[in-house]
Design a protein with these regions (language model features):
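Transmembrane beta-strands of outer-membrane beta-barrel pores
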Residues: 5, 25-31, 65-73, 115-121, ...
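Residues on the lipid-exposed face of transmembrane beta-strands in outer-membrane beta-barrel proteins
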Residues: 1-5, 44-50, 63-67, 95-101, ...
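Repeated loop/turn-to-beta-strand initiation elements of outer-membrane beta-barrel proteins
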Residues: 9-12, 59, 101-109, 145-149, ...
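Detector for outer-membrane/organellar transmembrane beta-barrel domains
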Residues: 176-265
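Transmembrane beta-strands of outer-membrane beta-barrel proteins
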Residues: 19-23, 59-65, 109-113, 135-137, ...
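Solvent-exposed loop/turn segments connecting transmembrane beta-strands
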Residues: 29-39, 55, 122-127, 195-202, ...
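Outer-membrane beta-barrel "beta-signal"
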Residues: 131-157, 306-320
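Residues that define the transmembrane beta-barrel architecture of outer-membrane proteins
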Residues: 1, 17, 36-42, 57, ...
Length: 320
């Protein structure tokens, strides 16, 4: 179940094709409920239309992010069969590639394919996560909130248009101050596989310095250096004689909309890997507080598996 608002401001949203955005609720099942629970989720989403506004069958890309709850976590005594999730709550990420067929002036028939992922980023172990691919079919109802304010009653004198007549996407624009040096600091906490089901935890630290270049108002790239501290390595990589820090390099792509930025870094290590894979990824969500500072939540990975969740702040000390 989802509730959405239609964007209209040409200056802010026109360049993104006038997306809709909102909140939703999810309830589902994952095999044996005594092992995995019956997951429910609360999430936010944004729907980016791709098709020409004149087409009756519209294609859109819709990412969503939220929290899943009502899970049954791993317990060595009471729930040893659950080797996927070690916490009662997890992050819920979903990516939907969908179509909407304009059935009536108020109703759409929606259908698509989606990918969903539940994970807690090794904040608790085990954390193999849960991945789900599926198809979806639904109905979408459009209504105009001004109708009840302007023309009240069961038989209004005039019926306002329910469906928003979306305009063509406005051209991308180059932005001023399109280059910067960014400094990002983040903390995290992890469990090891040996510590699953216990209160034993280890702290992590990330320091990132990169060069950031914006091509247009939507797209940018970055490249830079990473410094990591993972205190769990003292337990998981005994050959390192207590070493717990790594240095790496990365390159990345950003997609920017409103004050939010979706970030994807890919990198490798310049120093000894200390038992980690050859490469790491960093998918993240960034909120721009102002031109000089931002808050960011991301996931640092080991290859394609979660390493730890980063909670941090960033600064742009140099912009030009």
């Amino acid at each position: 179940v989802r509730f959405a608002w239609q964007s209209r401001d040409e200056e802010v949203w026109g360049k993104y094709g006038y997306p809709t955005y909102g909140v939703g609720l999810y309830s589902g099942f994952l095999g044996d409920p005594e092992v995995f629970g019956n997951p429910n989720a609360v999430f936010g989403f944004i729907n980016f239309p791709v098709s020409n506004p004149s087409r009756r069958n519209q294609f859109a890309i819709e990412p969503s992010l939220g929290l899943t709850y009502n899970l049954e976590p791993f317990d060595p005594e009471n729930n040893p069969l659950n080797d996927a999730i070690g916490a009662r709550m997890a992050v819920d990420f979903d990516l939907n590639f969908g179509w909407a067929y304009r059935w009536t002036p108020e109703m759409d028939l929606t259908y698509g394919i989606d990918f969903s992922h539940f994970s807690n980023g090794r904040s608790f172990t085990p954390n193999w996560g849960l991945n789900m691919f599926g198809v979806n079919v639904g109905l979408r109802y459009h209504y105009n909130a001004d109708q009840r304010r302007t023309y009240k009653g069961m038989y209004p004198e005039e019926k306002l248009q329910s469906r928003y007549l979306r305009s063509e996407k406005t051209p991308n624009e180059k932005v001023a101050d399109n280059q910067s040096i960014n400094v990002y600091l983040a903390l995290g906490t992890v469990q090891t596989e040996e510590g699953a089901g216990t209160d034993t935890r280890y702290g992590t630290f990330s320091l990132v310095m990169d060069y950031h270049h914006k091509f247009y108002n939507l797209h940018s790239v970055s490249a830079g250096l990473d410094y990591f501290v993972d205190n769990s390595l003292k337990e998981t990589y005994t050959e390192g004689d207590g070493e717990n820090s790594l240095v790496g390099i990365h390159a990345g792509y950003d997609f920017m909309f409103w004050r939010l930025t979706t970030v994807l870094h890919g990198g490798t290590y310049l120093t000894e890997k200390l038992g980690k894979d050859d490469f790491f990824l960093r998918p993240a969500i960034r909120y721009n507080i102002n031109k000089w500072a931002y808050a960011q939540v991301g996931l640092k990975t080991i290859g394609f598996a979660a390493d730890w969740v980063e909670f941090g702040v960033g600064f742009r000390p140099f912009r030009w």
